[in-house]
């Protein structure tokens, strides 16, 4: 995260004293719970995609996480990474990475109780943000607030946006047309490569393919 937590003090001696086991997962739990207490929050969230790879370790600390699986058309994800300053750039590698991430998330879904796993489709979110956020709040047993839709006005969003071009959009309202950009900006060859690698996952998640089957 390019933006440090504000108004939160993390003392090493207090963190160590609060740990019930000597693991990185326990440090993770204690630090986030400390931050939540200091801000008066009843919930805390870590948005790292890598959490899905360490779910068993995280759960070994005694917490029972709610998992939010935000998924997007992988071809638009690939296009975004091709423009970013980080990450793979070749469409084959991007397709492989996206496929592995979705497979890992779906494996986690299979081993998680339905009331602790929320599938959130990106395209549905940007088309009907309030409806989807109300559904998410219901899932988390949290009251919905209209302030949710004002995220881009927060000081944290402003601080994040100036940290680099990758985060420029966090100071903008939801971009309702931010979908299917790959149709305009990826070549038909790149689309075919992506679909040959990850077409099965695209279909499983409800997306349609652009390339005729005999060309995959």
Language-model regions: role of each:
Residues 1-46, 175:
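PAPS-dependent sulfation machinery
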Residues 13-16, 21-22, 82-85, 102, ...:
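PAPS-dependent sulfotransferases, especially Golgi type II membrane carbohydrate sulfotransferases
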Residues 45-47, 69, 119-121, 148-152:
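Short beta-strand segments
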Residues 47-50, 57-82, 194:
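Conserved phosphate-donor/acceptor-positioning beta-strand/loop module used by diverse small-molecule
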Residues 50-53, 73-77, 84, 124-127, ...:
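Short, solvent-exposed loop/turn segments at secondary-structure junctions
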Residues 57-62, 119-144, 170-173, 194:
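PAPS/PAP-binding and catalytic site of the sulfotransferase fold
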Residues 65, 115-117:
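Short, conserved active-site loop motifs that form the nucleotide-linked donor/cofactor pocket
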Residues 68, 76-100:
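A glycine- and Lys/Arg-enriched "phosphate-lid" helix/loop adjacent to the NTP-binding pocket
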């Amino acid at each position: 995260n390019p933006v440090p937590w504000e108004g939160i003090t993390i003392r090493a001696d207090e963190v160590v004293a609060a740990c019930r086991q000597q693991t990185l997962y326990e440090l993770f739990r204690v630090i986030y719970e400390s931050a939540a207490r200091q801000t008066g929050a009843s919930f805390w969230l870590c948005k790292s995609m890598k959490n899905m790879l360490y779910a068993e370790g995280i759960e070994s600390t005694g917490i029972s996480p709610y998992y939010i699986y935000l998924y997007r058309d992988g071809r638009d994800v690939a296009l975004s990474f091709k423009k970013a300053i980080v990450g793979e750039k070749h469409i084959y590698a991007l397709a492989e990475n996206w496929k592995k991430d979705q497979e890992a998330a779906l494996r986690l879904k299979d081993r998680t109780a339905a009331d602790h796993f929320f599938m959130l489709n990106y395209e549905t979110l940007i088309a009907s943000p309030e409806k989807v956020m109300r559904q998410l709040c219901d899932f988390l047993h949290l009251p919905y607030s209209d302030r949710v839709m004002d995220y881009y006005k927060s000081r944290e969003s402003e601080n994040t946006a100036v940290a680099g071009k990758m985060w420029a959009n966090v100071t903008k309202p939801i971009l309702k047309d931010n979908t299917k950009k790959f149709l305009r900006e990826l070549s038909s060859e790149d689309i075919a490569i992506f679909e040959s690698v990850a077409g099965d996952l695209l279909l499983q998640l409800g997306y349609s393919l652009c390339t005729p089957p005999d060309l995959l």
